[in-house]
Every structure is written in C-alpha cells, then in structure tokens.
Regions:
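Alpha-helix capping/helix-boundary segments
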Residues: 43, 94-95, 158-160
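Hydrophobic/aromatic ligand-binding patch that stacks against planar heteroaromatic rings
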Residues: 27, 98, 102, 145
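Active-site proximal beta-strand in glycosyltransferases
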Residues: 3, 86, 103-123, 135, ...
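An amphipathic, basic-hydrophobic alpha-helix
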Residues: 59-101, 105, 140
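Short, hinge-like loop/turn segments at secondary-structure boundaries
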Residues: 51-56, 105-107, 128-132
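N-terminal subdomain of nucleotide-sugar transferases
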Residues: 1-55, 82
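Membrane-proximal helix-turn-helix segments that form the acceptor-binding/catalytic region
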Residues: 105, 133-151
C-alpha cells in the first residue's frame, strides 16, 4: 500500500502534528506501507527519502510556522499522489485543499486526522472578535472540511465528541 500524507507543518517544527506524522511514518513503514509526505520547507533541511518539501515563508508574528504557496502545494501534492492508494491530510489549511483536490483528481479515497479543536482556542488569535461568532465559524468550516472526506481520524475521545 502507498499512502500520501499532506501537511502544512512538519519537522523541524516541533508540535503534536509533526510528532503524529512521524509516528505514522515509523509505524506504517514497519508494516510495509510506503509513505510519501508533502510538507513545507523551513530552511536548509537535508533531503529525506519520501518527503517532498514545498517552499514556505514565515507566518507573520510566528517564525516557527510556515505559509506555503497554494499553487506549489497543489502541484507537489498532485504529483506525489501518482501511484498512491490513499491520501491522508494532516492539517486544515492549504494542505487540506491540495490533498482533497489531488485525491479527487486521481480517484483516491481521502482521510484526515483532526488534530486541533480550533473552535476552542481561536479567540486567543483574534481576541477582538466575538468568541461565539468565532466558535460558530470554526465549527462550520470544520464541518464542511470533514464532510468532504471519506474518513476522519481523531486522536482522543474529546475530539470525537
């Protein structure tokens, strides 16, 4: 089996998503699954087998995260999906739409891991906007994204509920 993972974040950025991706990569490789990954380039990371890096620019106010170009992510994801059996999306940003588009174009099933309950902490990033309004918008976007998928993986019972 060949799986393509698509993410807006990966090492050297250390966070739960990067750690989860690496856990999937190790575990699935041990089971004989070929895993490909499309993720941002942060700087001068060495080339790594199975990892396609897309140019990324620092997020304003957050030097650890990267913004990836829409077209570059879509092109890299579509190319990497060739010969795959499944697309597994890891983040709900540009990678989500690139992974979904590549999967549909290649006729592949597409799943996502829903790592972050954005409706619970979006207020932290936009404190001047009403919390209830932000929560409803985040919930609506999450619902639309998840409903477009063939399956969703959640890392906890709280996320499932």
């Amino acid at each position: 089996m060949r799986i393509l993972m698509v993410s807006d974040v990966y090492f050297p950025r250390v966070n739960g998503v990067s750690t989860s991706i690496e856990t999937f990569r190790r575990t699935l490789a041990a089971l004989g699954v070929e895993l490909r990954l499309v993720a941002p380039r942060y700087g001068a990371e060495p080339d790594e087998p199975g990892v396609v890096r897309v140019p990324g620019w620092p997020v304003p106010g957050d030097r650890e995260d990267r913004l990836v170009g829409w077209r570059a992510m879509h092109r890299a994801t579509l190319a990497a999906a060739e010969g795959c059996d499944l697309v597994h999306i890891q983040t709900p940003f540009v990678a989500h739409y690139a992974g979904l588009a590549a999967a549909r174009r290649r006729g592949l099933p597409v799943i996502a891991t829903y790592h972050t309950l954005f409706e619970e902490y979006l207020q932290h990033y936009a404190p001047l906007l009403p919390a209830g309004w932000l929560r409803r918008r985040a919930r609506g976007l999450s619902r639309r994204q998840c409903n477009a998928l063939d399956g969703v993986i959640v890392p906890s019972t709280a996320m499932r509920e």
